Regions:
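C-terminal end segment of the histidine kinase catalytic
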Residues: 176-233
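Two-component histidine phosphotransfer core
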Residues: 1-175, 182-185
Length: 233
């Protein structure tokens, strides 16, 4: 909605070229997101492409106030994660990190492979938020004026998606030092498209096999012959 409002304002100001450029980027972003199946997974590379399209739109609104830094390891780029998992985090970073500050903020997205796991961190250099304590799952937080309750709702939704997809095999942490800034760390089991397809292929035969009919009990023959006598010469 913010993007549409910005386009409307540009049209009213007769800045048609800028409005057309923003509309084109918005169209590309929406097309990119609509081809993804709901609840499906994408590679980290695809998720980063989506984020770059989204940030390209926001860049036209905030200009030099919005700075981004993508750091993705080659192996991490192949890993899979739930589609559109990171976009709400970037949106929060813009709304509560970039927007409130005159100088804006930098948003960093880092993806790396740590042992058998994928680790993704989304952070910003905004005003941050205070935290009461950190629990095993979603930390209990007390938003400041800069980060209202909507942030907690967005984070809770992401946590719930991770719990549904990975159970206890995921890690979700919020960090906000007193000096400012805000970051969310996510860890998932490392999985590529190939390994996921292989897992599905090995699971399908067992699921597709029809239940076996109970066979008739086999007859049990008990020998009643006496033991064979030893021959004597």
């Amino acid at each position: 909605f913010n993007t549409l409002n910005s386009i409307s304002t540009l049209v009213l100001l007769k800045q048609s070229e800028t409005a057309n450029a923003m509309l084109t980027r918005l169209s590309s972003f929406l097309r990119h997101t609509l081809v993804t199946q709901p609840g499906g997974k994408v590679t980290v590379a695809q998720e980063m492409e989506t984020l770059q399209l989204y940030l390209g739109i926001e860049q036209m609104r905030f200009e030099e106030r919005l700075r981004s830094d993508f750091r993705v390891e080659p192996d991490a780029a192949k890993a899979q994660l739930p589609a559109m998992l990171l976009q709400p985090l970037v949106e929060n970073a813009i709304k509560y990190g970039v927007s409130p500050q005159e100088e804006g903020a930098e948003i960093a997205i880092v993806a790396q492979v740590v042992g058998p796991r994928l680790r993704v961190t989304v952070s910003d250099t905004g005003p941050g938020m205070t935290m009461n304590n950190i629990e095993a799952g979603l930390p209990a937080v007390r938003p400041t004026h800069a980060r209202r309750d909507s942030t907690g709702v967005g984070l809770a939704n992401i946590r719930d998606r991770l719990a549904q997809a990975y159970g206890e095999e995921h890690r979700f942490e919020i960090r906000s030092p007193e000096s400012g800034g805000f970051s969310v760390l996510i860890e998932l089991p490392f999985e590529t498209e190939e390994s996921a397809a292989l897992s599905e292929a090995t699971a399908e035969p067992a699921q597709a096999a029809p239940p076996k009919k109970p066979s008739a009990p086999s007859a049990v023959v008990t020998s009643t012959l006496p033991p064979k006598a030893h021959q004597t010469t």
